[in-house]
Regions:
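A generic structural micro-environment signature
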Residues: 7, 12-15, 55-57, 65, ...
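RNA pseudouridine synthases
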Residues: 129, 225-228
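Extracellular glycan-targeting catalytic surfaces
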Residues: 20-220, 232, 236
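Alpha-helix initiation and capping sites
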Residues: 228-232, 248
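Bacterial Sec-dependent N-terminal signal peptides
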Residues: 1-29
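Long, repeat-rich segments with strong aromatic
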Residues: 240-253
Length: 253
């Protein structure tokens, strides 16, 4: 699954440099004549997003042997302020990533998405520490961050049902990191079988999926304005949410 994901991103990146709506002689391409892509069913052996169980086993063996560079890398993780089990989540009711010039006066919290960025980093790093050390305090801390956002955040800020600034689309960058943390924590105290886990999956899907899918379809009605980084933010959000929720339709998108 990991290699499929890396391959997909590599191909997408390559195509971004060579894609064109015309062939060499100038004749337009009729994309409607192309065959529909084959739908593939992936067997998901969780965890299977950025890291697999085999990856964790490999790293734990290296750490047990104090092998380098793994030992130094883990020491760096241990020293991170985001990997401290005393870390406290700071969820917001409505996420905002707004342009300062246009929105600072009306929305003093115009960049409160940074709360999510920090908490996503902490949830992921704490999940790694739990998985690599088997110490409960790290699993508890990571889980509490994810639960706090699922319980307290209502989504991305909108007015009249629409985003008010295209920069809000980039909040999707955090979806992948959040989903990775949750994917790692599936096995923590059977969290993946709990109502808390289901609530988190529902929250991350309702917050990010529709926005990401709509952007990939319409590109905010200005397709020539957006570069590939905007697409990748939405693609990784959809793929990671699909893996987390075992949703083959999302994965195939």
């Amino acid at each position: 699954m990991k290699m499929d994901f890396i391959y997909t991103l590599a191909v997408t990146a390559a195509l971004s440099f060579c894609s064109c709506t015309e062939i060499e002689d100038g004749a337009p391409i009729n994309f409607d004549e192309w065959e529909a892509p084959e739908k593939i069913e992936f067997t998901l052996n969780h965890p299977c997003m950025l890291h697999s169980e085999a990856d964790f086993t490999y790293v734990k063996e290296k750490l047990a042997a104090s092998a380098q560079p793994w030992a130094d890398a883990y020491a760096s993780l241990e020293s991170s302020k985001f990997a401290n089990p005393a870390y406290q989540a700071d969820p917001v009711e409505w996420l905002k990533r707004l342009d300062k010039t246009n929105w600072e006066n009306k929305h003093p919290d115009y960049v409160n998405y940074t709360n999510l960025a920090n908490d996503a980093a902490a949830a992921y790093q704490l999940a790694l520490r739990w998985k690599l050390s088997d110490k409960k305090e790290y699993g508890d801390a990571a889980k509490s961050i994810l639960n706090a956002w699922a319980k307290n955040c209502k989504g991305i800020y909108r007015e009249n049902g629409s985003l008010i600034d295209p920069n809000e689309l980039l909040i999707a960058i955090q979806a992948y990191q959040l989903a990775n943390a949750a994917e790692i924590l599936r096995g923590y105290d059977k969290w993946g079988e709990t109502e808390e886990f289901k609530a988190f999956v529902q929250w991350i899907e309702s917050t990010f999926y529709a926005m990401a899918d709509d952007f990939l379809v319409r590109h905010n009605n200005t397709a020539d304005h957006y570069w590939l980084n905007w697409d990748l933010a939405q693609m990784t959000a959809i793929l990671s949410i699909g893996i987390l929720s075992d949703n083959q339709e999302m994965i195939n998108k």
